[in-house]
């Protein structure tokens, strides 16, 4: 709705500027949201510099030339100093309510757009995911959901490291130590991986065995490849379980060994050589990217002729470039250098570069995490802790409900709290996940938003029981004139703007902020305006319809954030 409002404002402003005898590029209209209007333009500033005139006088001159078409979403245009302010019409409000009720879960969806291939998580299969990994998963999954709602055709991939040094250690460990298969498979892999690293630290001669395994895999030794595959499959199976609990699903798992077997790795190395930017450094083949601003060279082949993860990643990205219109990678801050080198190398051979979202790390109050040293709290343990704490709150708030209900709500609230608390922070900022704060119903996190949705459901259910509401009855949105009603309608109308902004800038936190603000607007409305208790029947019906609208947009917001929307809490 808001995007249509902006489109109409753009058309009105362009016509007025032309009628005022002025010219400006569309990109120089400079629209922004404002606390004084529904939309404001800074075009007068640009025109002032072009025509050497006072921006305030220009704004007044333009506004005097404004003509608003009948039925427009723009009700009034005014000048406030150099700013040109646009105010929504009553029609805009009424149409928003009608559109939400008509489109329901489709409200806020954009027109069909390009295909995007988005890669996220891609953690090494040497143990369970920890909280550091799941920030990648949550950012990636939320972005995929946002992009889909914006209209993009999104395929989500997990790039499986099934042949690097760490996997050689995992395979070696599985042969040397007994796996405890009574444990979750990825945890069993972590146990032997940690033992293996202790052995390797104590006995450096074992490193030669790891090197030999890597050479065998590179040479295509079937037995070694099979042992690698079995170890990786066990770890990935456990990782999938964890991701599913987090409400994260990948469309495809792509193994890096695929590109070695197909010859793609060899081909891309030869093409990079053909650019004339490779050289030998201590027997290894490196790429000089100094003209791209990188002082450090990129190693693409070891001195023994074997490829590196980076080399195989280059081949993977070349393959991805042929699968979609856009490629998006979600990487941690420790990949900032290598992702830049990867983009530069791809550019040097004429391959489409990925768009990269870099995120800083999330930690727990307990400190840092390392699978190799065995110093980590797994995502599974974190989920258990959070849902147990959520269960305590549910038992306190709803002691009369069944155990099954309490556990279901605790899982929805706990996992929702994890997802929201991590995604609400801009990716480029580091954060500490504090589960007590994340679960605080008064802190306006996921539980607060979920509770707002449940409250809307409860109001509608109560209205049905009291025969005060018929969802199919005709309503009159023009009766919704209270300030809190108008604020709520306008906040719902801006859902498509938020989706568009988050999709364009690849910043999922803006949707998290919006969802909280929407919950605020709904709760303010319910606090100050009687709904079921409204005396006028038509007003009551319209307010109940507004509650239903809020329920729909809250549910859409939560769904796009990958968070469950409970009907009762």
Curated annotation (Swiss-Prot):
Disulfide bonds: none annotated. Pfam families: Arg_tRNA_synt_N, DALR_1, tRNA-synt_1d. One of its GO terms (molecular function) is arginine-tRNA ligase activity. Its main location: cytoplasm. It catalyses: tRNA(Arg) + L-arginine + ATP = L-arginyl-tRNA(Arg) + AMP + diphosphate. A motif ('HIGH' region) lies at residues 123-133. One of its GO terms (biological process) is arginyl-tRNA aminoacylation. The keyword Transferase does not apply. SUPFAM superfamilies: Anticodon-binding domain of a subclass of class I aminoacyl-tRNA synthetases, Arginyl-tRNA synthetase (ArgRS), N-terminal 'additional' domain, Nucleotidylyl transferase. Belongs to the class-I aminoacyl-tRNA synthetase family. This is Arginine--tRNA ligase. The gene is argS.
